[in-house]
Amino acid sequence: MRNYEVMYIIKPEVEEEKVTALMEKFKSVVEEKGAEVTKLDKWGKRRLAYEINKIKEGIYVLMQFKAEPAASAELDRVMKINDDIVRHMIIREGE
């Protein structure tokens, strides 16, 4: 299993309950593929470095997990089709 880190930005107008639901949804997506989530940290609302689709701030969330490559591919697919996600990036951490 490899170590992965994903940072994603949720639209600022999303309600707090839905933010929590999205965090749990993405956590369960990787856990269903046999991954172990080692860290899930909500950074809160922050200003973006540059405007994305007329959005100037977003809710940042950081998640670290240990998984096989299939889990990160599935998470990437799910995040791409979710309209509440402004941006996301999944990186494989060095050994």
Swiss-Prot record:
Keyword check for Cytoplasm, yes or no: no
This protein's GO cellular component annotations are: cytoplasm; ribonucleoprotein complex; ribosome
State any GO BP term from the record: translation
| Keywords assigned | Ribonucleoprotein, Ribosomal protein, RNA-binding, rRNA-binding
Which pairs of Cys residues are joined through disulfide bonds in the record? none
Q: Give any GO molecular function from the UniProt entry.
A: small ribosomal subunit rRNA binding
Q: Which stretches are annotated as coiled coil?
A: none
Q: InterPro entries, per this entry?
A: Ribosomal_bS6 (IPR000529), Ribosomal_bS6_CS (IPR020815), Ribosomal_bS6_sf (IPR035980), Ribosomal_S6_plastid/chlpt (IPR020814), Transl_elong_EF1B/ribsomal_bS6 (IPR014717)
Q: Which NCBIfam families match?
A: S6
Task: State its role.
Answer: Binds together with bS18 to 16S ribosomal RNA.
PANTHER family per record? MITOCHONDRIAL 28S RIBOSOMAL PROTEIN S6, SMALL RIBOSOMAL SUBUNIT PROTEIN BS6M
Q: Which family does it belong to?
A: Belongs to the bacterial ribosomal protein bS6 family.
Q: Quote the protein name from its UniProt record.
A: Small ribosomal subunit protein bS6
Q: Which organism is it from?
A: Desulforamulus reducens (strain ATCC BAA-1160 / DSM 100696 / MI-1) (Desulfotomaculum reducens)
- UniProt lists the gene as rpsF
